[in-house]
Each structure stands twice: as structure tokens, then as C-alpha cells.
């Protein structure tokens, strides 16, 4: 099972580090990561394997929501089922 984590906001030191820390905390394996800096805007898309995750998916989303608030960024965690359903419509 996989999930996609997206991060968008004003660039600042430590974004990748903080997102990675939460991935480690919940045993999410980063399989692919892409980041771009456009002027002062930071964007990142991360594909993670959640097969070995600790806790529930809701708890992971809540932790990333807290990080989003703390850093003043938009961070979304979306389960692969969402993307699979979009292709079935």
C-alpha cells in the first residue's frame, strides 16, 4: 500500500528533514521524492510505502496536519485508494 505526501509553501530550512522525521516515526518508506523551488515557493511530492506503518492512517494524517500548522505549509497525505478510484470513474 502506498500514499502520496504533497508539501507546498514558502521555502524554509528543514522542510525535507521534518517530513522525513514523521515518515521514520510512522515507518513510512520513501520510495520516490521530487522537490522544486520556484522563486520562494517550495513544492514536494513524496511517494511512500505504508505497508509497515505504525498507527492508523488517520493518526499519520493528524501528525502531518500538525506539522503543516507548525511550519505554515500546506501538507496533504492521500492514500493510493483515492487515485485508484479516480481512474475507475
Can you say where each PLM-predicted feature lies in the sequence?
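A conserved regulatory-domain signal marking ACT and ACT-like small-molecule sensing domains
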Residues: 1-89
Amino acid at each position: 500500500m502506498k500514499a502520496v505526501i504533497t508539501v507546498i509553501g514558502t521555502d524554509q530550512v528543514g522542510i525535507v528533514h521534518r517530513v522525513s522525521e514523521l515518515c521514520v516515526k510512522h515507518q513510512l518508506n520513501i520510495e520516490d521524492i521530487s522537490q522544486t523551488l520556484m522563486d520562494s515557493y517550495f513544492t514536494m511530492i513524496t511517494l511512500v510505502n505504508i505497508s509497515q506503518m505504525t498507527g492508523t492512517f488517520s493518526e499519520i494524517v493528524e501528525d502531518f496536519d500538525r506539522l503543516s500548522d507548525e511550519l505554515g505549509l500546506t501538507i496533504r497525505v492521500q492514500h493510493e485508494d483515492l487515485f485508484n478510484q479516480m481512474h475507475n470513474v
